[in-house]
Amino acid sequence: MNKTQSPSLNTNSHWYVIDAKNQTLGRISTHISNILRGKNKPSYTPYLDTGDYVIVINSAHVSVSGNKTNQKLYRRHSGQPGGLKVETFDQLQTRLPNRIIEKSVKGMLPKGPLGRKLFTKLKVYSGPIHPHVAQKPQEYIV
């Protein structure tokens, strides 16, 4: 009888910087989610955290195609009766530009404990400056 061989965890994670300036939201989100899951590595395992850390800068300058700036809606609910809040892409981009990329990437990650763990490896900043210089991140060209 053969035993199931599980791959050894490669704990050396890399840090990548992605510039979101003038990038399309969906296309950059797929690159980010693939890096977070580790699909760009030969040691990818669907049920293990083999991904890397991702720093996204200039999230305030991400774009969407077509007329989605006015038509794409983001909904949230306070939990109270009548507490549904709806805002467009343009309104959310002026109020919280990081939230747009976070919501897009979170929808592409697996649901459950692994997805929540992978989501903590995503760092999004609206400007060109980030505080993760000590990790020596590599620039990732999209």
Curated annotation (Swiss-Prot):
InterPro entries: Ribosomal_uL13, Ribosomal_uL13_bac-type, Ribosomal_uL13_CS, Ribosomal_uL13_sf. This is Large ribosomal subunit protein uL13c. It comes from the Eukaryota. HAMAP family: Ribosomal_uL13. GO terms for molecular function: mRNA binding; structural constituent of ribosome. Pfam families: Ribosomal_L13. Belongs to the universal ribosomal protein uL13 family. The keyword Chloroplast applies. SUPFAM superfamilies: Ribosomal protein L13. It is found in: Plastid, Chloroplast. GO terms for cellular component: chloroplast; cytosolic large ribosomal subunit. GO terms for biological process: negative regulation of translation; translation. Part of the 50S ribosomal subunit. Gene3D superfamilies: Ribosomal protein L13 (3.90.1180.10). Keywords: Chloroplast, Plastid, Ribonucleoprotein, Ribosomal protein.
